[in-house]
């Protein structure tokens, strides 16, 4: 299916929109990425499936000003002595998506209304922020993709244990590289256990059919495009 990628100014922010060329209302997925160009490796393959084996969908990406600030849910210590601490301002970005970006898209383009057709996904810290957004705004998001997400983030498992009850009728795609837990860093080395518990919590709350946990070959940076494509395909197979 042919598509367009357009850029829109929203105050101080730049919004990139991937939209298949169709007049039918579309589901919307917000993408937590360092820049919209990160999708160049998989958009053509995704678009080729749309209208055939996959329902068309719109993707929206607002480039973050500061990755560690915009995708961290609350302040936390730095991973390394020479790195800045996490500033913890993901709430502001989530509100930007929910209260500005999504209304802008629905006013400008035909979109499918409701949380069942609205999702968010991301990779690494962006994946953590995507899953956090599902907890933070369950009134808006009904699906999330967390790929190699930073679920080792300080306090995040406790946050999930305390808030898992707020999730219902949602779908979650989880993905992790099999080698990611092979690290000497004490926090990042817990990623395998963090993913296992997260998957268990979500399956109990949402049902096994609504949660996918894929373990992929390689480490954190292995086949990012391919894994993003798998996550998008799984989420869009339900819309």
Name every feature range the model reports, one short phrase each.
Residues 1-239:
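Non-catalytic cap/lid and distal C-terminal segments of serine-dependent acyl enzymes
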